[in-house]
Swiss-Prot record:
This is DNA polymerase IV. GO terms for cellular component: cytosol. The lineage of its organism: Bacteria, Pseudomonadati, Pseudomonadota, Gammaproteobacteria, Pseudomonadales. The gene is dinB. It comes from Pseudomonas syringae pv. tomato (strain ATCC BAA-871 / DC3000). Mg(2+) binds at D10, D105. GO terms for biological process: DNA-templated DNA replication; error-prone translesion synthesis; SOS response.
Length: 353
């Protein structure tokens, strides 16, 4: 069996990072995103300055303010977070289509079969971190390992803004010293039961047979045995049906005018064509669209039914979209809405039986 290469990407205090990016005066101060204390709100996330005071996610805002009286609490802006998440996933898709989102700010990537960087998962993770930093001005932590269980642990190993790699030959020694509380699925109740049995780390777990663990923990005992040996065969689940295919680029220097934007279209269109070829037979292309993000982070998206997907059509859309802001542009994107042909195929199979 080919050795898998799994990357786990986790944004660092994601919501708070977006707020500090968009409101630079918040940076360096204790900050939380959540509901107001007056309305019994809770903390969704907070930056590391706030965590130094003991502020944590899911804590009541009132309690958080007692721990940190200087804490600034801002309301969540979900659309801003979703947009940032979409930009990050657009970066992911430059390396692999095997992406399993866990939330807006966290995902697994299977890069086992990619040819980027000669197949080096470590270099891919480094490049993703670089691009997210340059394009979105936030940081992500990454873990690289032969499976999902270890990749997720690795991404947390050097947080924030870190990269940790567990190579196949390091798995046995690395896992042996792991506390059982690090194992996927082990909560307080299971950890307490393991502790009563004298099991505090994976080396202790390895001393027990699979049968003994199954007797104590039922079917989960088999899972415990596998994790203690660094085994996790769960695939990266990529079952979502795509609604569009797109390509976008954030430019190191803002594009000053419409002419500069139009010059970038041919390269974007070529990349879009390559991505569409990979999905041939799965989707029917629909409306073309363009996305423009201006230098002040305001943005607009414009699509048109019945328009072509040639360079001229995208030039017309871009011209109209640019006119909505008329300011220097930091990001350009183009794409196509998709209609899933697999649903139609499944219906045909259903009625042909």
């Amino acid at each position: 069996m080919t050795q898998r290469k799994i990357i786990h990407i986790d944004c660092d205090c994601f919501y708070a990072a977006i707020e500090m990016r968009d409101e630079p005066e918040l940076a360096g101060k204790p900050l939380a995103v959540g509901g107001s204390a007056e309305r019994r709100g809770v903390i969704a996330t907070c930056n590391y300055e706030a965590r130094a005071y003991g502020v944590r996610s899911a804590m009541s805002s009132r309690h958080a303010l007692k721990l940190c009286p200087d804490l600034t609490i801002v309301k969540p802006r979900m659309e801003a977070y979703k947009e940032a998440s979409r930009e990050i996933h657009s970066i992911f898709r430059d390396y692999t289509d095997l992406i399993e989102p866990l939330s807006l700010d966290e995902a697994f990537l299977d890069v086992s079969d990619t040819h980027h960087f000669s197949g080096s998962a470590t270099r891919i993770a480094q490049d993703i971190r670089r691009r997210v930093s340059n394009q979105l001005h936030i940081t992500v932590s990454a873990g690289v390992a032969p499976n999902k269980f270890l990749a997720k642990i690795a991404s947390d190993w050097k947080k924030p803004n870190g990269l940790f790699v567990i190579t196949p030959d390091q798995v046995e020694d690395f896992v042996a010293s792991l506390p059982v509380t690090k194992l996927h699925g082990v909560g307080k109740v299971t950890a307490d039961k393991l502790g009563r049995l004298g099991i505090v780390d994976c080396a202790d777990l390895r001393s027990r047979s699979k049968l003994a663990l199954v007797r104590e923990f039922g079917s989960f005992g088999e899972r415990l045995w596998s994790l203690a040996h660094g085994i996790d065969d769960r695939p990266v689940q990529n079952d979502s049906r795509r609604q569009s295919v797109s390509v976008e680029n954030t430019y190191d220097t803002d594009l000053p005018d419409l002419a500069a934007c139009l010059e970038k279209l041919p390269a974007l269109l070529e990349t879009l064509g390559t991505r569409m070829e990979r999905m041939e037979g799965q989707y029917r292309p629909g409306k073309p669209f363009v996305k423009v993000k201006f230098h002040d982070f305001t943005q607009t998206t414009l699509e048109q039914s019945g328009a072509g997907r040639d360079l001229g059509s995208y030039e017309q859309l871009l011209t109209q979209a640019f006119a909505r802001g008329g300011k220097p542009v930091r990001l350009l994107g183009i794409g196509v809405r998709l209609h899933d042909l697999r649903d139609a195929h499944e219906q045909l199979e259903l009625f042909s039986t």
